[in-house]
A protein has these predicted regions:
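C-terminal extensions
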Residues: 1-176
């Protein structure tokens, strides 16, 4: 099941150097204590955390107001722009593609080209990506590019790791 309001435990998967922007790196040392304290505060999902006051987030282990604002920004990092989804109906050829692309477009930076590459490589849903290794995704997409002589680039390792982390968070497949 796809869930953009991910469990708070997903912070441990999402908050690492492999899949976030450098401006969020300073939050990494806080992730374990944050998750532990947020759960104690009965904050179980991203939306629960978004409702917390700045004071509550300080109590959860963040050191100052700047870190609180950075954490709030991090929580919205993987929110999808609804306008991005409008493209799907224009580019999809059938219901199967449309269903697949609705999930794949949840991944950061994914639009038609990357979604089509993942689709052709057999990664049709976030659950497929969540249980895959970066090496498997890179190898399969590279194979499709070669086989179909596509003028596309293989996804970068960091991009694939980000997609795997987000897919795991959104499907509750929390493998660290």
């Amino acid at each position: 099941m796809l869930n953009a309001d991910y469990k708070i435990e997903a912070i441990k998967v999402l908050l690492n150097e492999d899949c976030i922007l450098t401006r969020f790196y300073s939050l990494i040392p806080y992730k374990d204590i944050l998750v532990q304290n947020l759960i104690k505060m009965r904050c179980h999902t991203k939306s629960d955390c978004m409702k917390l006051s700045d004071e509550s987030l300080l109590d959860a282990g963040l050191e100052d107001a700047g870190m609180v604002q950075l954490f709030k920004s991090f929580l919205t990092l993987y929110d999808i722009n609804p306008g991005k989804l409008k493209e799907i109906t224009a580019v999809c050829k059938n219901a199967e593609e449309m269903q697949s692309f609705q999930e794949l477009y949840q991944l950061p930076g994914v639009k038609y080209t990357r979604a089509m590459l993942y689709f052709k490589a057999g990664f049709r849903f976030l659950a497929d990506i969540a249980i895959s290794s970066p090496q498997e995704i890179i190898a399969k997409t590279e194979g499709i590019i070669r086989k179909e002589n596509l003028s596309l680039k293989v996804p970068l390792l960091k991009e694939v790791k980000t997609h795997i982390a987000v897919a795991r968070a959104f499907t509750d497949t929390l493998i660290e």
